[in-house]
């Protein structure tokens, strides 16, 4: 059990940044190459005998700003990052650096704004209105896009024996997301593979923290040492922008007339919010869902199938918000997948003033301006909170005991029991994302009796390598 309040000893934050530049370089090589990010934090947590310690957040010098910071790897210490009064999120989306503004049209976009900035409240209010106005269309558009993707999966498995799920789900996400919010199909203007256009823009923009299939030395020299320039993907970004400029003209009118925003700035904000945050968040949740349900076996799949088909008498029910809300086991399964594999593993902020941060068993003094970060692999597998923290337990969040654990689910940059507002940093689409995940599982079991993934399939904090190899059509 954790000690409480002032009973906890006050300690200096352990750990060291090492020799300038050299220490940062060593940590970066360990993080990306020699250890990998989970072992990187785990080994230092064991060395320091603490879930709170100093570390060089990558990528760091020489090509990126110094990444000196303090990592918070348990449920108690992490909570300070949810306190807007204590932590400033200005320009800390991915740590100590942010990509060149050329990647976002020259504007700081919503995820880089702190809650104390007036535009944060304005832009997030705009996002809420767009999501609210689109709410009834998400279900039907997902059903339509899922049908096309399922047909693609079936054809690919028949031809090649398996199909990779992440990239094939990419166009499904873009189609149903943008048809929902703009009423127009991006494939009509961006071609048959808009996913590749978005991934090029995303990949170059965030190359400093990205993983690829390149040899380690090539990846290190090409991507993690210096920020890549904007010009190689300029035309692809212009494709994305022009789609939103045309298809999203009504959204831009709303931004200008109701919220008093500059039209061009609003354009690039919507491109980023829907093209990075929303698109990637949705995309990254589908492969883990397929993986964990497949690996859970036939008996568990039968339980899900029974719940879904018992409440959904016809295919159209999969798009019904009311029907989806009745799927308690499916919702618990979604939360367990999100616990193990959140779409975003990291979060950062800077201390607004000198403060104390508590862990389960100690208190630590933090100075104003220090960079604080976390990795949710550890936070949502905190053994003090979760029994068998590394195991997939799909009914973990069922019943009264499960409900008591809900505040510890923080995939949305906020607690499951909290709601996003214009004045906090919690994902504005939290509720929609969970509903979409529930619908996706329902769509799968309304079309298939079961499915399997290849033995080589795996999911981790850095890679979603899930290949479907068997789809058993509904009998």
Curated annotation (Swiss-Prot):
Pathway: Lipid metabolism; oxylipin biosynthesis. CDD domains: CYP74 (cd11071). Its EC number is 4.2.1.183. One of its GO terms (molecular function) is oxidoreductase activity, acting on paired donors, with incorporation or reduction of molecular oxygen. Pfam families: p450. InterPro entries: Cyt_P450 (IPR001128), Cyt_P450_E_grp-IV (IPR002403), Cyt_P450_sf (IPR036396). The keyword Manganese does not apply. Keywords: Fatty acid biosynthesis, Fatty acid metabolism, Heme, Iron, Lipid biosynthesis, Lipid metabolism, Lyase, Metal-binding, Oxylipin biosynthesis. Its cofactor is heme. It comes from the Eukaryota. SUPFAM superfamilies: Cytochrome P450. It is an enzyme of class 4 (lyase). It catalyses: (13S)-hydroperoxy-(9Z,11E)-octadecadienoate = etheroleate + H2O; (13S)-hydroperoxy-(9Z,11E,15Z)-octadecatrienoate = etherolenate + H2O. Belongs to the cytochrome P450 family. Divinyl ether synthase involved in oxylipin biosynthesis. Catalyzes the conversion of (13S)-hydroperoxy-(9Z,11E)-octadecadienoate (13-HPOD) to etheroleate and (13S)-hydroperoxy-(9Z,11E,15Z)-octadecatrienoate (13-HPOT) to etherolenate. Has no activity with the corresponding 9-hydroperoxides (9-HPOD and 9-HPOT). This is Divinyl ether synthase CYP74M1. It comes from Selaginella moellendorffii.
């Amino acid at each position: 059990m954790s000690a409480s309040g002032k009973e906890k000893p006050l300690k200096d934050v352990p750990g060291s940044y090492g020799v300038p530049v050299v220490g940062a370089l060593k940590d970066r090589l360990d993080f990306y190459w020699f250890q990998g990010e989970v072992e990187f934090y785990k080994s230092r947590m064991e060395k320091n005998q603490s879930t709170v310690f100093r570390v060089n957040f990558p990528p760091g010098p020489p090509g990126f700003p110094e990444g000196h910071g303090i990592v918070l790897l348990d449920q108690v210490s992490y909570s300070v990052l949810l306190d807007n009064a204590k932590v400033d999120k200005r320009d800390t989306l991915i740590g100590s650096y942010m990509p060149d503004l050329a990647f976002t049209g020259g504007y700081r976009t919503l995820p880089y704004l702190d809650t104390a900035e007036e535009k944060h409240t304005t832009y997030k209010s705009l996002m809420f209105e767009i999501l609210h106005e689109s709410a009834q269309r998400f279900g039907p558009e997902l059903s339509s896009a899922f049908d096309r993707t399922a047909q693609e999966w079936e054809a690919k498995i028949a031809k090649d024996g398996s199909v990779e799920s992440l990239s094939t789900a990419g166009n499904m996400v873009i189609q149903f997301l943008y048809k929902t919010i703009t009423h127009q199909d991006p494939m009509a203007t961006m071609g048959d593979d808009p996913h590749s256009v978005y991934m090029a823009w995303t990949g170059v923009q965030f190359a400093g923290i990205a993983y690829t299939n390149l040899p380690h030395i090539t990846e290190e020299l090409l991507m993690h040492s210096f920020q890549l320039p904007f010009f190689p993907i300029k035309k692809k970004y212009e494709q994305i922008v022009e789609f939103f400029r045309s298809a999203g003209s009504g959204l831009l009118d709303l931004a200008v007339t109701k919220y008093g925003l500059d039209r061009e700035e609003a354009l690039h904000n919507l491109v980023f919010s829907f093209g990075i945050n929303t698109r990637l968040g949705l995309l990254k949740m589908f492969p883990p869902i397929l993986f964990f349900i497949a690996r859970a076996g036939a008996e568990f799949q039968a339980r899900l199938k029974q719940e879904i088909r018992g409440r959904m008498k016809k295919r159209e029910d999969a798009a019904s918000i009311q029907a989806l809300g009745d799927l308690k086991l499916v919702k618990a399964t979604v939360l367990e997948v999100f616990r193990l594999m959140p779409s975003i593993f990291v979060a950062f902020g800077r201390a607004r003033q000198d403060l104390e941060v508590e862990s389960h068993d100690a208190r630590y003094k933090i100075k104003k301006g220090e960079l604080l970060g976390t990795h949710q692999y550890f936070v949502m597998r905190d053994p003090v909170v979760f029994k068998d923290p590394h195991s997939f337990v799909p009914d973990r969040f069922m019943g009264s005991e499960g409900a008591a654990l809900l505040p510890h689910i923080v995939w949305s940059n906020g607690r499951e029991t909290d709601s996003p507002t214009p004045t906090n940093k919690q994902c504005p689409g939290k509720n929609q994302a969970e509903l979409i995940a529930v619908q996706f599982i329902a769509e799968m079991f309304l079309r298939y009796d079961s499915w399997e993934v290849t033995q080589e399939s795996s999911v981790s904090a850095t890679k979603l390598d899930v290949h479907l190899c068997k789809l058993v059509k509904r009998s």
